[in-house]
Every structure is written in structure tokens, then in C-alpha cells.
Amino acid sequence: MVTIAIMAQALVVEQSRTVPVTVADAFSGTVPMPLNELFCRWYGPIPPIKAVRDQTGIWDAVGQTRTILLQGGGSMAETLTSFNEPHSFGYTLSDITGPMAALISGVNGEWLFQPAGTGTKITWRWTLHRRSAATAPLLPAFGRLWKGYAGRSLEHLSDLLVG
């Protein structure tokens, strides 16, 4: 399922996929996964993650931060804002550099894990905050691009979780 909603200052996009594993296994398999393993391919102009820096311990405590480095340059600071095992976790992306910085000032992200039949529906949601009024008309195009990126990423996550 794909949803796109435009708010005055932001665009909400989400993508979902049902995976044949339990909610607990989906959550515990997703949270600690190295980002450069999950997000390892280009999708149009959206680059793969090259590396994660400055993370201490496992990613499970609200307030933790890390720096995400992108292929081809660019980076962003990620802060864990919610952690409700095994149902959801949320984060913000800020201090965005590289090509996305011209369009987006920040992102609120959320991963949701819900029972679905004998598996788990995993939903990945981004709220994109525009850089300026001038870039606002470009957000829907980026949102459509992001949903393709998210769909492919969730497909890859499914493959990794099912093994």
C-alpha cells in the first residue's frame, strides 16, 4: 500500500509490505540491521548508504544519535525519537547535506510492525519537511520517487528477514 499526503509544510509518504515472519522477529531483525546492508542500491538519484558513524551500542534507546554517510557525498544526522518494541520505532533526520538538502530540511521517519495473517505488515513512513516555499512544488515528485525506493528497500528487507 502506498500513501502520499501533502500538508502545508510537509509531505507524508509511506510504503508497506507483508513479510512471512512474526512481529517480534520482524522488529528484532530490522532494528539492528546495518543500514549499508539494507539500503545498498541506488534508486534513481537516491543514493545507497555508504556507512554509519558515531553510533554507540545497539539502536534501541530514545535520544541515541548517529551520522549516516551516503554514496557520492552527502550525510544526515539521525536521532531515535521513539522505541516501542516490537511495534514501532521513530527517528528524525536532520543536518542533511548533499543533493537532498536543496529540497528537504528534515525528515520524521517511522517503522510500524503489525500482525497480518501469519506474518507481519511492515510500514515505513516519512514526513518530509520542505526546505522552502520555492521547493514545495517539487515534494510530490520526490515523494513518488521515494515510494519506489521504499518499496524496493522493503522487498530487500523481506528477503533478508526470511533468509
Question: Positions of the model-derived regions?
Answer:
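Short, solvent-exposed aromatic-acidic interface loops
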Residues: 93-98, 125-132
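Glycine-rich portal/gate segments that line the openings of hydrophobic small-molecule binding cavities
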Residues: 37-38, 48-102, 152-163
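A generic structural signal for beta-strand entry/edge sites
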Residues: 10, 86-88, 117-121
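A conserved amphipathic terminal alpha-helix motif
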Residues: 127-163
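Hydrophobic pocket/interface hotspot
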Residues: 26-30, 66, 80, 91, ...
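Amphipathic hydrophobic-ligand
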Residues: 9, 103-108
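Hydrophobic ligand-binding cavity/cleft-lining segments
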Residues: 1-58
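Hydrophobic/aromatic beta-strand elements that line small-molecule binding cavities or substrate pockets
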Residues: 15-17, 76-82, 106-115
